[in-house]
Design a protein with these regions (language model features):
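Pyridoxal 5′-phosphate
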Residues: 1-402
Length: 402
């Protein structure tokens, strides 16, 4: 909390949805607004802004086990997924089958469904599992063998935090003339990812969760070096041109991954996200991952002793190697418990988790600012709400964001 904005008497367990505000980001944004934009105006493109994405890509590469020229920062995860899937379909590198599974984040499914219709491909195949806890890898592999092509999976499942075996699935996909597009959104900044060692060919993710980049922070894409020139972005924007400031016609894509740029970079958002990445590098991703394993194990032990007798079920893998950095609880009253935690009681502590349908309470652990004491107090607060039946006083009305 030395490095982040902290609200007194509040325990924040939602870093898996939106990370905290780094104090340095506040200073960086203020300086950018007052000086770079306010005083320097257009001159700041040359003085500060044009090289900003590359600087961030150099830093992200250290966290993701990639080369900087294999990464591109910008746009949103949804837009980037559209560009990547479209480029793969157009390349004919693999058969034009689109496959995902029922654990994937819905926006990925929506994008793939839309592309299948737009490009008149075979309908999207969704591998459905019997539970939300983990993937049935046998079922998934059978579908890949049957319908090889472009597979999109989330490295960490957004509901249960199940962590997919990245390298072995990449190897299996390659053996079956397929490419897996990995969504790293719930993993980046908290899982020790090595895109090279895991033989990953395509990946993307957001930076506003465990990387603490801020709401709407630009996302990133990764394309294995050998694939870059074989793929073409469907959005031919001027920043993807080999010489954007020549303003020449016709469009000639940049040689490297910059061909996946489109419009003008989101400068203020890029400035805001740098402090969070710097803090992750300062802490060290190996240290962050170790603490995440220890803290999720501690939380699960507390849940077993304090909440399981009250009817809660753990919907997160018990093995440290098979989970990301949030723990999911299942109970028919999870929504009202969630509201009670957020509202607090009298002058007591407020706990900020989140809720996912139909009845899941997600407790996100961001090791870079979550303490073991935070975890203990949060679980004791859930127990208090249940034992006193405090949730009976909470209505079931839900806001748009839960």
């Amino acid at each position: 909390n030395t490095y982040f904005h902290h609200t007194p008497n509040e325990i924040y367990l939602d870093g898996n949805s939106l990370g905290k505000l780094p104090l340095q980001a506040k200073a960086d944004i203020r300086q950018a607004i007052d000086s770079q934009w306010g005083q320097n105006l257009i001159r700041s493109w040359n003085d500060h802004w044009l090289d900003l994405p590359k600087r961030l890509e150099n830093k992200l590469a250290q966290l993701l086990g990639a080369d900087p020229d294999e990464l591109k920062v910008g746009e949103s995860t949804s837009v980037n997924l559209y560009k990547l899937i479209h480029a793969l379909l157009s390349s004919k590198i693999t058969p034009n089958n689109l496959v995902t599974d029922s654990l994937n984040f819905p926006t990925d499914v929506y994008v793939m469904e839309g592309l299948a219709k737009q490009l008149k491909c075979n309908p999207l195949i969704i591998v459905n599992y019997s539970s939300d806890l983990k993937a049935d890898l046998t079922l998934l592999k059978k579908e890949i063998e049957k319908q090889p092509g472009i597979i999109c999976l989330s490295l960490v499942a957004y509901k249960s935090a199940w962590l997919y075996p990245m390298k072995s699935l990449n190897e299996f996909a390659e053996e079956n003339n397929s490419i897996i597009v990995w969504d790293l959104s719930h993993a980046a900044g908290v899982v020790d990812i090595d895109l090279h060692l895991s033989k990953t060919k395509i990946a993307l993710g957001c930076t506003y969760k465990f990387l603490n980049g801020g709401p709407g922070a630009p996302a990133f894409i990764y394309i294995q070096k050998d694939l870059i020139t074989k793929l073409h972005s469907p959005i031919q924007g001027w920043f993807g041109h080999q010489s954007p400031f020549d303003f020449s016609l016709p469009y000639i894509p940049a040689e490297g991954i910059s061909r996946f740029d489109a419009g003008t970079p989101q400068v203020l958002s890029l400035i805001a996200m740098e402090a969070g990445i710097d803090l992750s590098l300062k802490a060290g991703i190996t240290n962050i991952r170790k603490k995440s394993k220890d803290q999720t194990a501690y939380m699960i032990d507390l849940i077993d002793s304090k909440l399981t007798p009250l009817g809660f079920e753990i919907e997160t893998p018990l093995s440290q190697e098979e989970r990301g950095s949030h723990v999911t609880l299942k109970h028919q009253e999870c929504w009202r418990v969630c509201k009670a935690l957020i509202q607090g009681k009298d002058s007591g502590v407020k706990v900020i988790p989140d809720f996912r349908p139909p009845n899941y309470l997600r407790l996100g652990i961001a090791p870079i600012y979550t303490s073991f004491v935070d975890i203990l107090r949060a679980i004791e607060r859930v127990k208090e709400i249940m034992v006193t039946q405090e949730y009976f006083n909470i209505d079931n009305e839900r806001p748009t964001v839960t």
